[in-house]
Amino acid sequence: MKIPITMCHGTDPEDAFTPKKMPLDADRFNRYFAIAHELGFESITYNELAAWRSGEGALPPRPIMFDFDHARKNIYHEIAPVMQSYGYTGNLFIFTEPVEGMYAGGLPPDDERVDLIWEETRSLMEMGWLIG
């Protein structure tokens, strides 16, 4: 079985990590997920893939994985709601230093903060996301 794995390196046009030639904002993601949904893809996590590989689980007929590697707050506030509207979840890989180090003295106002906080990360997990 072939499983497409998408990797999103930066999702915010204002973020230094996002490639400037093709920013992946909420509108582009909506179109992207609409196409995947129209083609019949169903999202899976690495845990589901591992369970299938070990013979302990099944995969949907057309699995797809959506990976994100920067825990920016727009993943929770913009991208996850779009994904959820199509029944999708993602795999988020977190570099914890920004969460633990940057905000050690307290959280800045929401409009100044760029990274996820633990509460938002837990909420993504409750939505079915894999956090790695």
Located regions from the model:
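Catalytic alpha-helical scaffold of carbohydrate-active enzymes acting on polysaccharides/glycoconjugates
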Residues: 1-132
